[in-house]
Structures are given as C-alpha cells and as structure tokens.
Amino acid sequence: VLSLPSLTGCAIDKGTALASDFEENWAGTPDVAKIHTTKNNTLPFKGSSTGTLILKDGTSADRVTKLVGEMREYVARHDKITGRIAADGITFTVVADKGRTGQVLALWRSLTADDRVADADINDEPWKEATDRWRIEVTAVDATGALAVFKDMYAKGDRHRPLAGVMVLRVRGPGLFVESDFNDGFPAEAIAAYEAVLAQYPVVGATLRRDAVSGSAVSIVVAEGVDRDDAVELARSAAPNLGTAVEVTSDSAG
C-alpha cells in the first residue's frame, strides 16, 4: 500500500489525523470490504489511532497473508497507528515484528480451520517495556468446544500453537466462560473443579475466572434438583487450594 503525503505531525487532533491517513492510505485496496478506524486525541498534537481492514467474505488465506505483510510494513513506518485485520470471523493485530506477526498469522489460520470456534479477537497490549503481551478472546459454539479450545491453546504442538507473551486468554461459549489464572497461566484446579462436577451432574453454566487472591475463582450452576452439597464437595475436593473461591449454586429457574 502506498503512503500518501501527510500533515499528521502538525495536527492538533493527531489521533483524528492518523485515522484519516489510515483510511486514505488503504482506500481501494482489493478484497477490503470496509475500513474501521478509532482515534485517541490524548493531548494537543499528541494521539494515536487504530485502523482495521475488514476483508470480504471468502478472501483466500494467501491474500490474507499478503495483506498482513503489507500491514506489518505499514505499522513499522507509523508507530502511532495500530493496524488490525478482520478475516473469517477472526480479528487480529499486526505488529512490526516479523516473528510475532508470523505467530499471530499461524494462530489465525488454525482458529479459522477449527469448527468449534465462532469468532475470536487477538489483540496486542504492550505495557511500558513489556512488548510481548497478547490478549486473546475466543467465542466457541458450545461449552464443550470452549473448554477444548482453551486447553488446545495451552497445549504445545497441538491444534493451536500458543503465542509467546499471552497476558490473558479468555474463551466463552453458551454455558461456560474460562480464562487464564491471575498469573497468566493454565487454571488447572479451576478446570478440575468444573470437570469433577460435570462428570456427575448436569451443569447449566460455569464461570472460571481469574482472582487476585486465589489465582482463580470458580462459579458453577447445576441443574435444579441436583444434590448441591455433594457438588460442592466434588468441586472443592478437586481444587483444594482454591477453597471458598469455588462456589456451586442451583438453577432455581429449572
């Protein structure tokens, strides 16, 4: 993509000017259905922008790869612009580093090939000197798929290759929300608690979220009529280090 001459540097609302530049630079790009931009005018003459290329349905993987390469070069020249691409239900950030962008592209390919995945967002969230920080959010088609995808994202060499520097991973599906623990790791005990109850009783819904005190917290809703006390015992026995951070309630609505 060509970079057009810009007066961004002397714009009072720099974020607005950056967004305008992005739209102009990428306008008319083949296979791009829409361009979405956001602008952040932090202070006079200072700001940033995020630009997302929303690709046409059916855009080939080879074409996506080519556009990713062009976007990587673009953001390398425009450090106040965050470049993103949305293709096949997966939206992801493209960074200037070739290796990191290659990892994200590989994850995009595997997620789009996974029929358990409905959509996903892979976002770069650098903080101070820590540049390798990713936030990944995935929506799965059902609870079983959500847990399986979550596990696969942590399994080295399995279906989805993990990214380096993931800050938080969240996967949700109807009846389940699960995220990495407070130390950005695999919440083994939280998942064990959920699976222990699921193996014995029908589960209406569950939330396995990060918790600053225990690392993870578990909330499980079992079907009405289930022996809740037994379900609590099952869950807490499977996750002894979480203690009262594991809760089980009954679905009173049936």
Where are the predicted features?
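Short edge beta-strands and adjacent turn/loop segments
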Residues: 31-52, 120-132, 203-220
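Short amphipathic alpha-helices in soluble, non-transmembrane regions
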Residues: 25, 63-74, 111, 148-157, ...
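Long, acidic/polar, low-complexity amphipathic helices and coiled-coil-like
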Residues: 48-50, 65, 75-176
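Extracytoplasmic/luminal low-complexity segments enriched in Pro/Gly and acidic/polar residues
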Residues: 184-254
